[in-house]
A protein has these predicted regions:
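Long alpha-helical rod scaffolds of large eukaryotic non-enzymatic complex subunits
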Residues: 1-257
Length: 257
């Protein structure tokens, strides 16, 4: 024989019919906060632990940090749309967001600083200090044992790997750029990386290809970059592809002169 079940929602609905609007709102607030205490507090504690673990990873890549920032942003948006963004939840999510964006900026700086340490041929000026963390070079090219790519005798191969890594990196960062608020910072970081890559291509043209024309030409490298980037019909990709086309044209002009 089945035991009778207790339907609390029915009693609650019946009792709330006699409440004023102010009392009903206060009652809903109490229910919401009690639900938060019982259900969401443990979940938020788990999220905080997971988030801290991700952020504490040494040399966390930009893409990983952007994914976490986007997750927090989406949770905020969903909570707002469902009208359940109570102050406790908003505080937790906003704190995570504010902790993440400085790390994104630092990770971009690491990518730039890592590239600054590289040369193809003799370095002009002091060796820039790297902030460490490896950057895309270590993760995608298997690491480099020297800061002068000519020393390994495979400058063209190393440079092409770096350029290929950048096209992937660029596409991933752009696809993860979901808020206009931080778009300028992210595109600015990509622009600084582009500047360092341009320097390396020019050093390759001067110190390697000018004397040993048995490898890929710097112009062909730039044309290849343009082809890969322009295959994605987004404004950011088109703009970046145009920069590489312009650099390719500059090498054509230098050859003719």
């Amino acid at each position: 024989m089945r035991e009778p079940t207790y339907d609390a929602s029915a009693v609650l609905s019946c009792n709330m019919l006699s409440l004023s609007a102010e009392e009903e709102q206060r009652h809903e607030s109490i229910v919401t906060r009690e639900s938060w205490r019982q259900v969401m507090e443990p979940a938020m504690a788990f999220l905080a632990e997971f988030y801290a673990t991700v952020l504490a990873m040494p040399g966390a890549p930009v893409q990983q940090l952007l994914t976490m920032a986007n997750l927090m942003h989406e949770l905020l948006q969903v909570a707002r749309s469902r009208r359940c963004l109570i102050s406790e939840l908003e505080s937790v999510l906003m704190r995570h967001l504010l902790e993440t964006w400085p790390l994104v900026a630092k990770s971009l700086d690491t990518e730039v600083d890592t590239l600054k340490t590289l040369t193809i041929g003799p370095r002009i000026g002091p060796v820039p200090r790297s902030t460490g963390g490896g950057g895309l070079l270590e993760r995608w090219t298997g690491g480099l044992m020297t800061t002068d790519l000519m020393r390994g005798g495979q400058a063209a191969d190393a440079l092409q790997k770096i350029l290929s890594a950048y096209t992937q990196f660029f596409s991933q960062v752009v696809s993860l750029t979901t808020t206009e608020q931080h778009q300028g910072m992210l595109l600015g970081g990509l622009g600084r990386i582009h500047t360092e890559l341009t320097r390396l291509v020019r050093e390759y043209a001067t110190n390697v290809y000018a004397t040993h024309q048995d490898g890929p030409s710097p112009r062909d490298m730039c044309v290849s970059m343009h082809a890969v980037l322009s295959a994605t019909p987004y404004d950011t990709h088109v703009h970046e592809a145009a920069k590489w086309a312009e650099l390719a044209d500059s090498f054509s002009s230098e050859t003719q002169n």
